[in-house]
Amino acid sequence: MSLKIIIIGGVAAGAKAAAKSKRLLPDAEVHIYTQDTCVSYSSCGLPYYIAGDFEDWHKLIVRTIEEFEKSGVHIHKLNRVTKILPADKKILVKNLETNECFFVEYDRLIIATGSFPYKPEIKNKNLKNIFTLRTLQDGINIRETMEKSNHITIVGGGYIAVELIEAFVKNGKNVTVIERSAFILSVFDEEISSLIQTFILENSNDRVKILNEDTVSEFVGEDKVTGVVTQKGFGFETDMVIISAGVRPVVDIAVDAGIELGVTGAIKVNSRMQTSIPDIYACGDCVEKINMISHTPVWFPLGSTANKEGRVAAINACGGVEDFEGILNSAVLRYHALNISMTGLTEKAAQKLGFDTVSVVITKRDRAGYMPEVQNVTLKLVADRRTHRVLGAQAIGCGDADKRVNTVSVGLLSNMRVEDLLDVDLTYAPPFSTSIDILISAARILKSKLS
């Protein structure tokens, strides 16, 4: 009898798990149940659709429902899984169009429920024109409302918030950001996040205002939002609001089924994406990860990680053996010409974990100074004082900041020491780098500090 694999959720991890399962076991019965109207789309691309970088939102769909069905993967859209019954190996499903509820049996279950936007308790937060960005429909709604708006408020200052600031400014909108930290992108160390905030303010045609160390006390309006009042007493008019105050893992049905959560509040899995209950796997934004430097549990949801985990979950659910060892918190984004990237531990994160850190911040040209496209890059390199192990890197600049960070990312996997980084044989030609790359220069300074 063929194996029946049920997957809950189908955006990134779930879609990857379904496709991989069908390729591994062509005779298996593979089903995706999703409360969404679409599957397998790039939610990471939504800010760029909103910006108008491309006009057709269909380009965000990686694989259509019709393509899945043709391959033998059955898609059940607008079907919400409301309960998992592990003892009976069944799920309870509610059809959101007909309200019909029914049971479905499984041999293997893969949970890929993702994450949901966190909405703080703010007075009148349910007024019209207050949005969060998670689904394809959210992106479509935000773009349509943006086109009719002049002033937009963003609550929060993380990755998505920065991408949306860029999108709105590009479309000639005025933006006010309310951020509870001293600088936006507070996941970075302050030397870097302060430079990012300065760049945004100086390169936005005076359209951006950032209210740091403040929060929203209430939204103003009767039917739709017309204004914002902050905890510090600032009040201003606005046409729409984006709440971008972080996300949380969707774990309610897992908890109800008795599946163990980790210390981060996400589903706890082993390296084979197995949960605490046999034949139930989990992957993507709903699961806890392991930081490969500190070997501690973390929750850092990214689309690239979700795809890797979906693949590993499928292999193991189909009877194979594959491990996903963890993450390095590698990330990249941009604000207009500014590239922003990081990998590994920031200095503040490393210190919280007990590392005795040494760091350097250096600014240097990204290629030969006589090349017309030369730009500056600012790099922060962090190491452990005792072992000299490189712990992480952060880089920003209008030049190629991200390729320096990617180089460090590879080194982190091999426990690279500062001295090892000095020996890396990087490529050189005037259009691509300086003869002594900024990465090598930073390592030299770090070595001097360590000795």
Predicted regions located by residue number:
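A conserved FAD-binding loop/helix module that cradles the flavin
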Residues: V269, C283-T346, P431-L450
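Rossmann-like dinucleotide-binding cores of NAD(P)H-dependent redox enzymes
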Residues: L60-I61, H151-T153, Y159-E218, F300-A306, ...
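Glycine-rich dinucleotide-binding loop and its adjacent helix/turn
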Residues: I111-N171, K209, V263, V269-S271
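Flexible, glycine-rich terminal cap/loop adjacent to redox cofactors
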Residues: S2, I8-A12, K20-D27, Q35-D36, ...
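FAD-site-proximal beta/loop scaffold in flavoenzymes
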Residues: N126-S149, V220-V229, G235-I315, T407, ...
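Beta1-alpha1 glycine-rich phosphate/pyrophosphate-binding loop at the start
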Residues: S2-H74, E166-E191
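Catalytic nucleophile loop
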Residues: V11-G14, G158-A161, A314
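A Rossmann-like FAD-binding core segment of flavoenzymes
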Residues: D27-E29, S71-E97, V104, K170-S271
